[in-house]
Curated annotation (Swiss-Prot):
GO terms for molecular function: glycine dehydrogenase (decarboxylating) activity. Coiled coil: none annotated. It comes from Nitrosomonas europaea (strain ATCC 19718 / CIP 103999 / KCTC 2705 / NBRC 14298). The gene is gcvPA. The lineage of its organism: Bacteria, Pseudomonadati, Pseudomonadota, Betaproteobacteria, Nitrosomonadales. This is Probable glycine dehydrogenase (decarboxylating) subunit 1. Its EC number is 1.4.4.2. Transmembrane segments: none annotated. The glycine cleavage system catalyzes the degradation of glycine. The P protein binds the alpha-amino group of glycine through its pyridoxal phosphate cofactor; CO(2) is released and the remaining methylamine moiety is then transferred to the lipoamide cofactor of the H protein. It catalyses: N(6)-[(R)-lipoyl]-L-lysyl-[glycine-cleavage complex H protein] + glycine + H(+) = N(6)-[(R)-S(8)-aminomethyldihydrolipoyl]-L-lysyl-[glycine-cleavage complex H protein] + CO2. Belongs to the GcvP family. N-terminal subunit subfamily. One of its GO terms (biological process) is nucleoside metabolic process.
Amino acid sequence: MPFIPHTEEDVAEMLTSIGARSIDELFDEIPAELKTGKLTQVPPGLSEMEISRLMYERAQQDGFYLSFIGAGAYEHHIPAAVWQITTRGEFYSSYTPYQAEASQGTLQLLYEYQTMMASLAGMDVSNASLYDGASALAEAALMAVRQHRTSRRILVPQTVHPVYRSVMRTIVRNQAIEVVEVPYDPATGQVAIDKLDQFAQEEFAALIIPQPNFFGVLEQVDALTDWAHDKQSLAVAVVNPTSLAMLKPPGEWGRRGADIAVGEGQPLGIPLSSGGPYFGFMTCKQELVRQMPGRIIGRTTDLEGKEGFALTLQAREQHIRRSKATSNICTNQGLMVTAATIYMSLLGPEGLYRVAAHSHANTVALVEQLEKLPGVKKAFHSPFFHEAALQLSVPADKVLNRLKAQGVLGGVLLENHYPDLKNTLLVCATETKTAEDLDKYTEVLRQALAASA
């Protein structure tokens, strides 16, 4: 369709129709000091050759660091075939598959993704993705409130990722939903189940259950799930998809299983690239499918009896009345889902298990080595997956700076989110780390501790 700009006559007719004298009058409520015709902070334009050289020079400034940072974004090996296939034009440049007869490849891929995620989580249904793990948790909270009907309160343990909690509060704040936090046990790093008793006589739409939690610790998911169901609340799982290849899936937690399972899909073939783009996943039980946000791909047969795939449930504001929509999720993260589907297909169940097992083994080995250093001890005495919190006897921020100077990113400073966890690092070692990497971390930490004493 060609673009035809408005003529002066068009503009004059529209202004007369709305009773305005000029286009500027439409924006007169904007303070004059905020109006500008120039972008003063933007440099002048560059040619392709100039910008290529500039980016090359900037890239040379980047150093290589051995990273032991996790906290929600994880460094995993991604087979070269994943993005070689993902960036094919059929996937890379395609838009939302509204026209089913012309988009069978994309629709089948999304259907396979849903099947894999539902299987991985032990749930009945998966949608075609959400924006990221944090917004997926917020959507789960909204979904739980819609399903519960009588309560607009959500119980959220402090062991849930602090950024997830912040995003959830932001999204639900203007919908009259109250978020109530549950403290953690300082000895175990788990949800303090005994502290849940104070809420025994109160009504909540859902209890959020992280597995593993932000500290890397494994929660008592069976007891927490049963507690929620005994109180007529929904159990909402927040999980690391890599861990599901090794741990009990949410659908098998407790007597009845979790009702909803969400999480961040980045570990499934998405690279660490300045924080995104990632994608969120959501799975649930069949009885909740009508409350699920986003879109679902279904398998059907056409008039000739041939198998095909189509967009089935699309309870979003672009398709139905805004007041009836479950979410404003838009084109979402289809390309990221493409990469995740290819990643899971290439690795298969055995490959995913090996990634999880190797990551766990590496973190166990690293923690055992580091605990032998004077001034290092585990912050919590509980089982963990592939992250662990370590408490130092010296200022942890200075230690991290010394490690970085030696080419090692030593972890996340937990006191930034948990003021009571002074000088405590959250460290992670995935399958990408070798024995030599673990030894290097141990040695540079030993030197940093000695220099900081």
